A protein has these predicted regions:
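N-terminal Rossmann-fold NAD(P) dinucleotide-binding loop
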Residues: 15-16
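Conserved mid-domain beta->alpha element of the FAD-binding
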Residues: 207, 251-315
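Redox-cofactor binding/interface segments in oxidoreductases and associated redox assembly factors
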Residues: 9, 145-146, 263
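Glycine-rich FAD pyrophosphate-binding loop
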Residues: 7, 11, 20-43
Length: 382
């Protein structure tokens, strides 16, 4: 039986980043993917600057729009639009973006095996066995799990979650006049449910329209999406895709490794808690894990995540708490020049949330706001 140096479970941005980093360093790498590229993935598909930097030397990003304008509303009211001189977010379709990452991993030397779902993970002193759906077994010295938060590797490692949200999304086909209306612009709507928001992301002849809210509010979340689409005048637009998924943010003490099995991206619960942005965390954690395997220092992956990713997640939880308790204050802050600058820096990858919140004036403001009681969840009247 072939024994691979590394087997990666899952061929999304996290898994393919791990495979690319490892294979490029000479690690004999196999990627196991349950589907076949190109495949649709429920995702807003907005790449912030941090994500663009992570793939700059790897692929040409298949951009369908570059956004420089953002309209903010609070449950459809009190809207305002801000514009920046340079693009803030790059829009991609995940089937194209992921397929380019796959090609880059293959070019680096990795083998990608598609339609190969993994059903079980077992470790022994010599390595790791992966049992596939067809009954065959793959052996590897090390495994990186990138099969999502509900996958077998997350269960094997024992990942624990602090926050679970339900995201619902429709991909709407729109005529030329709607394409022109939305070109270069996104809409973010702070929603009526605690911690919820909705978005419109333009991608040429399609609009990705979605909402996200805490799990357990399924019916109200679906109603929020329906009302949001109606309000946009898009209720009759044909849907190319209509889907949903759960996003899970890790608990602070959740493991990232069990023996010779590491988890990355969604499988590790690595994403930004306030925006639920996950692609940048997937790309970075995958690269960190692949490099750790190449260097023979698996514990180094845990250290790197703790140093480079966890601080921003902790800051994101503080922002989410303020947003959940007082969305009207959050809406007002984004309208101010300092609030807009913070948003721009986040989008362009020029400053992480922990770096921003560490500034003295921001610390003082946040400390004051955190002492304000939570508001009643009311719809704005003007």
């Amino acid at each position: 039986m072939i024994v691979w140096d590394l087997a990666v479970v899952g061929a999304g941005p996290a898994g393919l980043s791990a495979a690319y980093a490892a294979a490029r360093a000479g690690v004999r790498t196999l990627v196991l993917e349950r589907a076949a590229h190109p495949r649709y993935k429920t995702c807003g598909g907005g790449l912030i600057g941090t994500s663009l930097a992570a793939v700059r030397d790897r692929i040409e990003v298949p951009a369908h729009d570059r956004v420089d304008r953002v309209t903010f509303t609070w449950d459809g009211r009190r809207g305002f639009t801000r514009r920046h001189r340079a693009p803030l977010v790059t829009m991609v379709r995940r089937e194209e973006f992921d397929d380019r990452l796959r090609a880059a991993a293959v070019a680096a030397g990795a083998e990608v095996r598609e339609r190969a779902p993994v059903r079980a993970v077992e470790q022994d002193p010599e390595g790791v066995s992966l049992r596939l759906a067809d009954g065959t077994t793959v052996r590897a010295r090390t495994v990186i799990g990138a099969d999502g938060s509900s996958g077998v590797t997350a269960r094997h490692v024992g990942v624990r979650y602090r926050q679970v949200d339900l995201g619902l999304e429709v991909e709407l086909e729109v005529p030329p006049e709607q394409q022109e209306r939305w070109r270069g612009q996104v809409l973010l709507d702070w929603g009526p449910l605690p911690g919820s928001y909705a978005w419109v992301f333009p991608k040429d002849d399609r609009l990705t329209v979605g909402v996200i809210a805490a799990r357990g509010e399924g019916e109200r979340t679906r109603e929020y999406l329906r009302r949001f689409v109606d309000r946009l005048g898009l209720a009759d637009a044909p849907a190319a895709h209509d889907s949903g998924h759960l996003t899970r943010c890790r608990a602070d003490d959740s493991p990232l490794r069990q023996g010779r099995v590491l988890v990355v991206g969604d499988a590790a619960g690595l994403l930004e808690p306030w925006s639920r942005e996950g692609i940048s965390y997937a790309l970075r954690s995958g690269e960190l894990a692949g490099a750790a395997v190449a260097e023979g220092d698996l514990a180094g992956y845990e250290r790197a995540v703790g140093e480079r990713l966890v601080p921003s997640m902790r800051a994101g939880y503080r922002l989410l708490d303020l947003f959940t308790r007082r969305p009207e204050i959050f809406h007002g802050l984004v309208a101010t020049p300092p609030g807009w600058r913070m948003f721009v820096r986040f989008c362009q990858g020029r400053a992480s949330f922990d770096e921003t919140l560490a500034r003295r004036e921001v610390r003082a403001l946040l400390s004051l706001l955190e002492r304000i009681p939570a508001s009643r969840r009311s719809v704005p009247t003007s």
